[in-house]
Amino acid sequence: VILISNNNKVNTSDKEDIHDNLEDLSKNRDDYYEDDKKNTSFLRSLAGLVTFSTIIPLGIYTSIEAVISVIWLWPLLNALIGLGGVVIAYILLKLFNMSHLLVATIVISYIFLIMGYNHIDGLLDFSDGIMVHGDSKKKINVMRDSMVGTAGISTMVIFTVMTVAVLTNLIDYNCLWGILVGEMSAKVSLLTTCILSKPAEDGIGKYFVEDMPITNYITAVLISGIIAYIFLGYVGLFGLIGAIIAGALISYIAKRNFGVATGDVLGTSNEIGRLLSLIFIVIAIPLF
């Protein structure tokens, strides 16, 4: 990562070095997604999805086509991550008798960490982009800028407080399985945005929007619906609906502001999808 202070002048040779380094970084990033058809078995594709999505050190890289071929399992992968959150919450509550607020904070910290903070970064950039006055090109440039503005920081604070609050409410209801359903539904929100959006001309996000088969989306929703119903019944399905609404909403906002869905848009959809899913679960618990 290269950081340039606004207060320091950069001479020509430094600019050339920076340009060369950025080209190397871009090349390395593209190499990750090179269309290498060798060894793209189902298990390797699945391992590639895990490597792409988390900080779990599998170290297995494959083509973007291979990752997309198993994208219907993305919510299931998130469900396993959510299961880890359920286990953590249960241990902290039963063995250490921690307060619900502290447990909720630890659980969301675990989720952010294991996901590598990737989607959080998208939420920050997305917030900065939509708050800028100007055309879609200007908004996209701001969204892709390495600096974080007031809108991004403010959104992050509000989002984190709301997430911790709703998780605390969930624990108050003794509904720990809601952690699993909410995390799984986050990816359904992301996939919903993929289906409803137009791809950008470049960036990682364009592959998911451009090459996302509708059959994969339907399969992902059906699997998620079954899992949600098994663990929480109609409450779980209500949470899944909340995530789908979130995905559609983020797609609409992205179209209005950027015209396309970038990786930052998809990351935002993941985070807002989790939050809205959890809120819908909390609303549904007294109803069902």
Question: PLM features: what roles do these ranges have?
Answer:
Residues 2-116, 132-138, 145-146, 152-288:
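Hydrophobic alpha-helical transmembrane segments
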